[in-house]
């Protein structure tokens, strides 16, 4: 399949690597090239899922992600962070349909992770909802399939994750950005931590449900 998985992390998030890999292995149901981009700490393997790991001395988050993208030999990239713990089965059928539709409708980013939140959508002549020209999150790190060339264009080397979303979205306001969302999707993941590495509300319930260790 014409798809790679890009996972961003940092040394500080090392306690998340085991539960992330466990839930990824449990709910990601097809073979893909999975690229884990970190900083200086080697990322252990906790499950049967194979990850290609790259440690980068780039000082910025976006600089490291751009190095990871160089290893992606596919036209499309499923881009996520390591504090996203899946509890929804992503199948080969899901991905095949989404990628075919991205090619058919010339989509740059297709968000595939659940309810709209703060995003604003408009109708389109596709099976998906289109982000409005003034949507606050045209760029989002929520689980999405990206056209590789578009992702590279948006990742300025100096960006933090927050710059990527906020500044990146502001630069695309009122442009033909071609970003869409499958709004039929349920919530597909639990966001384990918030700013400051604080555990998210609901972590204990999710941990018990998924039989995960605390971190």
Model region roles, listed by residue range:
Residues 35-36, 77-79, 108-113, 145, ...:
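A structural signal for short, well-ordered beta-strand segments and their strand-loop junctions
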Residues 75-85:
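Short beta-strand-to-loop acidic/aromatic patch adjacent to the donor-nucleotide binding site
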Residues 18, 91-99, 161-167:
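Well-ordered, non-membrane alpha-helical segments in soluble/globular domains
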Residues 88-118:
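Conserved donor-nucleotide/metal-binding helix-loop-beta segment in metal-dependent transferases, i.e.
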Residues 122-136:
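Short, flexible, basic/aromatic active-site loop/helix in glycosyltransferases
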Residues 138-206:
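Catalytic core and acceptor-binding pocket of nucleotide-sugar-dependent glycosyltransferases
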Residues 1-62, 68-76:
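N-terminal anchoring/stem segment of glycosyltransferases
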Residues 10-13, 40-43, 83-86, 115-119, ...:
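Short, solvent-exposed loop/turn segments at secondary-structure junctions
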């Amino acid at each position: 399949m014409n798809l790679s998985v890009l996972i961003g992390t940092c040394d500080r998030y090392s306690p998340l690597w085991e539960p992330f890999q466990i839930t990824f292995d449990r709910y990601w149901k097809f073979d893909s090239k999975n690229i884990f981009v970190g900083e200086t700490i080697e990322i252990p393997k906790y499950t049967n899922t194979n990850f290609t790991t790259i440690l980068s001395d780039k000082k910025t988050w976006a600089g490291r992600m751009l190095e990871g993208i160089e290893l992606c030999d596919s036209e499309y990239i499923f881009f996520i962070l390591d504090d996203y713990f899946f509890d929804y089965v992503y199948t080969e059928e899901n991905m095949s349909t989404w990628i075919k539709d991205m090619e058919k409708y010339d989509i740059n980013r297709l968000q595939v992770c659940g309810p709209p939140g703060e995003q604003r959508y408009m109708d389109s002549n596709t099976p998906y909802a289109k982000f409005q020209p003034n949507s606050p999150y045209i760029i989002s790190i929520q689980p999405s399939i990206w056209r590789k060339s578009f992702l590279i264009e948006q990742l300025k080397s100096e960006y933090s994750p927050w710059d990527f979303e906020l500044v990146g979205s502001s630069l695309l306001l009122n442009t033909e950005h071609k970003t869409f969302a499958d709004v039929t999707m349920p919530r597909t993941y639990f966001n384990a931590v918030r700013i400051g590495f604080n555990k998210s509300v609901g972590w204990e319930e999710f941990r018990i449900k998924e039989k995960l260790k605390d971190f």
